[in-house]
């Protein structure tokens, strides 16, 4: 179909986003051009700056435009002694929204996957081991995803922590709040039963 080359280029560029297919990209492109050109310009400027200026924190490896992110440079967080290990920067945002954690993080940017050739050094475990050896860390909270690879990664890190006499704990997995028991898969239910706790009055 004969159309604007720039419009086609815009649609193809939008398809790099996760979950955006041809139809969604077309709809987004037309919306920006028809209704919100100023918003499109802001988006372009923000993307350009983010792509060129955002790197990784030297301590935890999350995304930041500084050498060390705001969380890692916070004195109160440093005094906490806890490090929460997650697979991606998005996991930090999810945990921070709960308001239940006041320590620092370490981002793996993935998980161990020998079949894909992803080993310990590929996910920064050499850097994590260095922190275990040099910093006063009292507990490592393993918040990797509840997948086979996530569990294997958590177990590997737990063994690493044991070598440095640092306590390692795993976040609980179980039945979601508001969910119905009959709809929960067997693996999740098994984790729930294994991780049960006493009710205290």
Swiss-Prot record:
Keywords linked to the UniProt accession: DNA damage, DNA recombination, DNA repair, Metal-binding, Zinc, Zinc-finger
Cited Gene3D superfamilies: 3.40.1360.10, 6.10.250.240, RecR Domain 1
UniProt-listed GO biological process terms: DNA recombination; DNA repair
Gene symbol of the encoding locus: recR
A Pfam family this chain is assigned to: RecR_C
Metal-binding found in the keyword field: yes
Name this polypeptide is given: Recombination protein RecR
Signal peptide location: none
Start and end residues of each Toprim domain: 81-176
Sample GO molecular function, one term: DNA binding
Functional note: May play a role in DNA repair. It seems to be involved in an RecBC-independent recombinational process of DNA repair. It may act with RecF and RecO.
Family annotation (HAMAP family): RecR
Zinc finger (C4-type) boundaries: 57-72
Source organism of the structure: Shigella dysenteriae serotype 1 (strain Sd197)
UniProt keyword Zinc, yes or no: yes
């Amino acid at each position: 179909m004969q159309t604007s080359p720039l419009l086609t280029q815009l649609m193809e560029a939008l398809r790099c986003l996760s979950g955006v297919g041809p139809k969604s990209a077309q709809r987004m492109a037309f919306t920006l051009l028809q209704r919100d050109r100023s918003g499109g310009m802001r988006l372009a400027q923000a993307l350009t700056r983010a792509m060129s200026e955002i790197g990784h924190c030297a301590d935890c490896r999350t995304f930041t435009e500084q050498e060390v992110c705001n969380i890692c440079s916070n004195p109160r967080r440093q005094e906490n002694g806890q490090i929460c290990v997650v697979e991606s920067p998005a996991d930090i945002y999810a945990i921070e929204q709960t308001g239940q954690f006041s320590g620092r993080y370490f981002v793996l940017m993935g998980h161990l996957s020998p079949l894909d050739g992803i080993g310990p050094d590929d996910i920064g475990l050499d850097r994590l081991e260095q922190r275990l050896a040099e910093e006063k860390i009292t507990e490592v909270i393993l918040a990797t995803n509840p997948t086979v690879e996530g569990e294997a990664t958590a177990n590997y890190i737990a063994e690493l922590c044991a070598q440095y006499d640092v306590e390692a704990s795993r976040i609980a997995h179980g039945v979601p709040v508001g969910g119905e028991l009959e709809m929960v898969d067997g693996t999740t239910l098994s984790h729930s039963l294994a991780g049960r706790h006493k009710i205290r009055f």
